[in-house]
């Protein structure tokens, strides 16, 4: 073998080794690489509402962790097949922690989680877990009960209005807690419900609000994602109670308060665990005590004695002395659902499929 051919073979061997080395580096994740995080939302972020509150959580983790993380968020993703495609795309593109912030993302996320065992998934408002998928929720019903005290105290017609998205337990328990809070101070109060079968549809939310006002409701609240209910009530000169965010900029005169959601600390905790490699799938359900649910400032029209009742109920809730579904709880037909001296269990809450007394109409099945 000539010196030339030997040198050529050596050069070829070194080139191959360098190429292989570069491929290994390119295909691995350095400890210095940022943790890629994805958020999937069912509605636009906007400046108030369900998705807006979750986006405050995104901003909180970006401020907290800086260049240790890289975040991508996708808005207005329909529940179902499209959600599965979006979640799968996020996982395929290297996002190692993915949050899905709508109930209807649950089954699509389960499918994707099984296909990406090395990725962490978190689903909001659902009930399923996997080896690499947890779920998280807030005890919205606690805030509903407190806001019901306000509504029951302020109504003149004794008819409250409620614009609701879908007849799932999360929404139903909110309606029931709201009227129980109202009746704790005003036994004559009743609530009428209009279902719009959408999380975010400002047009239908507005139409439902007007319909409820036409039926005699003088205070309107909602379990939907936009500000349309508060805005429509303001235009009609009727009181409202916002949901998700403080919506007083859309109801400066007539919003009495709002049930507010606070996700920031939850997202910070999950990201920290992912960075520390201590993340585990859990089912988290925080409420007023944990700071995940609150009320915005009360309208100046709310008397001090009403504000005091709300504050006392909140303090009792935090102390474990007050549960919105402490027995006896009777459904519309008079059937006892929770016995006197007992509190409803989380399991029964999570499958609530009945209206309590004080709710007008029949629950869609």
Q: Whereabouts are the PLM-identified features?
A:
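Glycine-centered signal
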Residues: 7, 28-29
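N-terminal secretory signal peptides that target proteins for export/translocation
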Residues: 1-9
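A residue-level marker of the well-folded mature domains of exported/periplasmic proteins
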Residues: 31-365
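Intrinsically disordered, low-complexity repeat segments enriched in small/polar residues
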Residues: 5-6, 14-15, 324
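Bacterial N-terminal signal peptides
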Residues: 11-26
């Amino acid at each position: 073998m000539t010196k030339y051919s030997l040198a050529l073979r050596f050069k070829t061997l070194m080139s191959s080794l360098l190429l292989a080395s570069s491929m290994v580096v390119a295909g691995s994740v350095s400890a210095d690489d940022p943790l890629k995080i994805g958020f999937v939302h069912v509605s636009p972020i906007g400046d108030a509402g369900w998705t807006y509150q979750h986006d405050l959580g995104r901003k909180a983790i970006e401020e907290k962790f800086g260049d240790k993380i890289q975040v991508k968020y996708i808005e207005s993703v329909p529940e179902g097949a499209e959600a599965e495609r979006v979640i799968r795309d996020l996982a395929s593109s290297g996002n190692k922690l993915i949050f899905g912030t709508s109930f209807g993302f649950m089954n699509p996320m389960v499918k994707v989680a099984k296909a990406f065992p090395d990725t962490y998934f978190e689903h909001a408002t659902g009930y399923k877990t996997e080896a690499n998928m947890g779920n998280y929720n807030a005890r919205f019903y606690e805030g509903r009960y407190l806001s019901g005290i306000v509504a029951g105290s302020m109504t003149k017609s004794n008819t409250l209005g409620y614009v609701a998205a879908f007849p799932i337990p999360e929404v139903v328990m909110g309606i029931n807690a709201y009227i129980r809070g109202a009746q704790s101070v005003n036994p004559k109060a009743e609530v009428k419900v209009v279902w719009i079968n959408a999380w975010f549809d400002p047009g239908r939310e507005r139409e439902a609000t007007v319909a409820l006002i036409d039926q005699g409701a003088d205070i309107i609240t909602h379990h939907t994602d936009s500000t349309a209910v508060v805005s429509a009530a303001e235009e009609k000169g009727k009181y409202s109670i916002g949901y998700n965010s403080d919506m007083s900029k859309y109801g400066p005169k007539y919003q009495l308060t709002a049930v507010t959601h606070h996700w920031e600390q939850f997202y910070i905790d999950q990201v920290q665990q992912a960075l520390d490699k201590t993340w585990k799938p859990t089912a988290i359900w925080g409420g007023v005590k944990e700071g995940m649910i609150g009320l915005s400032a009360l309208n100046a029209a709310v008397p001090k004695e009403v504000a005091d009742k709300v504050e006392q109920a909140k303090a009792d809730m935090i102390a474990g002395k007050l549960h919105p579904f402490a027995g006896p709880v009777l459904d519309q037909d008079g059937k006892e659902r929770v016995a006197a001296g007992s509190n409803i269990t989380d399991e029964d809450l999570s499958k609530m499929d009945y209206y309590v007394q004080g709710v007008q109409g029949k629950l869609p099945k």
